[in-house]
Amino acid sequence: AGVHARGQTASVVLHGKAEDGFFTEKVNKLLPPDIRIREAGLEKNGFHARKSAVGKRYVYQIDTDEKPDVFDRRYTYHFPKKLDIAAMQQAAELLTGTHEFAAYTDKKDETSTKRTIYAIMVGGQGGRINIQYEGTGFLYHMVRILTGTLLEVGMGTRRIESVTIALEAKDRTKAGFLAPARGLFLDEVYYKEKSWRE
């Protein structure tokens, strides 16, 4: 399974007015069962689902139990290791803020690798760990590489301060492994900056 989305957004330009419920009822009937339009609304001219966004929230789900959950295995990364959550949280704190994230992308020809991460929250219960990322935007594979890096910190195979060394070096080989796509969810796209930074 690839990356999932609970809060994917899209925009279309209509010639004329769509009747109420057109997208949430009529279009939903034509979509496959794993895709659903939950809400639709009108926006001002010039709105673009991707270009008008001011931020995004991603969640990465990890299953640390010895055996993978048969129901959730397509939506979590099975990683049966004992993790130091406090160390992961300390490393996450070093990654927040505005930085050059060249070490945390697999795309070499990015025009700019500067991004702002407002928060990385690491937590969980039992065998389930969630890592939540909130920022202005993310580079190609960035969230998955950040996740792999934090998991290495949690295992004790990577020092906490190494996450900063990777940032400064701008060298992909200094960062952690690429975590699999199946644990990653686009949780929400933000269009009003104040509402999600407070």
List each language-model region with its residue ranges:
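Structured-RNA-binding interfaces characteristic of tRNA pseudouridine synthases
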Residues: 1-198
